């Protein structure tokens, strides 16, 4: 496939790691955040991949821990006038699209996503223009501008069902931006899919040989894999699914030991779900290999206690999410299509 932008050759500079806080500093910021949430009539929504102390704070303050879409849905239904989104930038944008009347704050607007960065809207528009006969389906991990170009937005939890539905209608698909998830969906459905070639820097680093060695060390363990992982890793899995689906699989599988191939942030909620089971990280480096993300998104790690307190206290252009009104209206169309489709699956 020829594209103007090649995500495979792009090197994304990682943000600096947050300065560690002392125990006293953590206690200070936790109490400050709790007070500011009440004063601002705000609720905190956190992604599964944020650090455990952030997820714990969201729980303690009546917030939400979930995937990106459920974060936005929770925020839209919640009576709070302000949403504090602990995640990456596209999650804040999605929350704003679904709750345009609310103030959306983020600890930092510099928290990126390699899938979002790997799908620049100008190049993606040109790619779509070159294939006008195809239905455009984009993953939730994209900018508002890319969503606005799409016919459908989709999450990993319903990707197979949606593409199977579109395939049954005889539609040919453009899929963006995750090539591994696109490959997985194509194999599951047999649909005619033309994939953009983006990848998640975390899931792309899982190594087959190292995972095989870990499996040999723990032959009684089940392997849980997020479909953003390379095909060879997916083929080793006992369960494949989105973050929420992997947590459900952890409860359902009889195995007492689980090897988990996704961001280690998920361990907080997964361990709550299966307190008696042992969770092991799938390896992201092996012999002769090194890892950059090492199973944790560096941009998710930017959502620290100090940054959250600052967002609630200062607001302003460094923390508030804005989406152009015309762009918002266009992006809402494929998002609502997805929500309606998801409702039919649940119903």
UniProtKB/Swiss-Prot annotation:
<dbReference type="GO" id="GO:0008987">
    <property type="term" value="F:quinolinate synthetase A activity"/>
</dbReference>
<dbReference type="InterPro" id="IPR003473">
    <property type="entry name" value="NadA"/>
</dbReference>
<dbReference type="InterPro" id="IPR036094">
    <property type="entry name" value="NadA_sf"/>
</dbReference>
<dbReference type="GO" id="GO:0005829">
    <property type="term" value="C:cytosol"/>
</dbReference>
<dbReference type="GO" id="GO:0046872">
    <property type="term" value="F:metal ion binding"/>
</dbReference>
<feature type="binding site">
    <location>
        <position position="243"/>
    </location>
    <ligand>
        <name>iminosuccinate</name>
    </ligand>
</feature>
<dbReference type="GO" id="GO:0051539">
    <property type="term" value="F:4 iron, 4 sulfur cluster binding"/>
</dbReference>
<comment type="similarity">
    <text>Belongs to the quinolinate synthase family. Type 1 subfamily.</text>
</comment>
<dbReference type="Pfam" id="PF02445">
    <property type="entry name" value="NadA"/>
</dbReference>
<feature type="binding site">
    <location>
        <position position="113"/>
    </location>
    <ligand>
        <name>[4Fe-4S] cluster</name>
    </ligand>
</feature>
<keyword id="KW-0662">Pyridine nucleotide biosynthesis</keyword>
<feature type="binding site">
    <location>
        <begin position="226"/>
        <end position="228"/>
    </location>
    <ligand>
        <name>iminosuccinate</name>
    </ligand>
</feature>
<protein>
    <recommendedName>
        <fullName>Quinolinate synthase</fullName>
        <ecNumber>2.5.1.72</ecNumber>
    </recommendedName>
</protein>
<feature type="binding site">
    <location>
        <position position="200"/>
    </location>
    <ligand>
        <name>[4Fe-4S] cluster</name>
    </ligand>
</feature>
<comment type="pathway">
    <text>Cofactor biosynthesis; NAD(+) biosynthesis; quinolinate from iminoaspartate: step 1/1.</text>
</comment>
<comment type="function">
    <text>Catalyzes the condensation of iminoaspartate with dihydroxyacetone phosphate to form quinolinate.</text>
</comment>
<keyword id="KW-0408">Iron</keyword>
<dbReference type="InterPro" id="IPR023513">
    <property type="entry name" value="Quinolinate_synth_A_type1"/>
</dbReference>
<keyword id="KW-0004">4Fe-4S</keyword>
<feature type="binding site">
    <location>
        <position position="297"/>
    </location>
    <ligand>
        <name>[4Fe-4S] cluster</name>
    </ligand>
</feature>
<keyword id="KW-0411">Iron-sulfur</keyword>
<feature type="binding site">
    <location>
        <begin position="139"/>
        <end position="141"/>
    </location>
    <ligand>
        <name>iminosuccinate</name>
    </ligand>
</feature>
<feature type="binding site">
    <location>
        <position position="68"/>
    </location>
    <ligand>
        <name>iminosuccinate</name>
    </ligand>
</feature>
<keyword id="KW-0963">Cytoplasm</keyword>
<keyword id="KW-0479">Metal-binding</keyword>
<dbReference type="GO" id="GO:0034628">
    <property type="term" value="P:'de novo' NAD biosynthetic process from L-aspartate"/>
</dbReference>
<feature type="binding site">
    <location>
        <position position="156"/>
    </location>
    <ligand>
        <name>iminosuccinate</name>
    </ligand>
</feature>
<feature type="binding site">
    <location>
        <position position="47"/>
    </location>
    <ligand>
        <name>iminosuccinate</name>
    </ligand>
</feature>
<keyword id="KW-0808">Transferase</keyword>
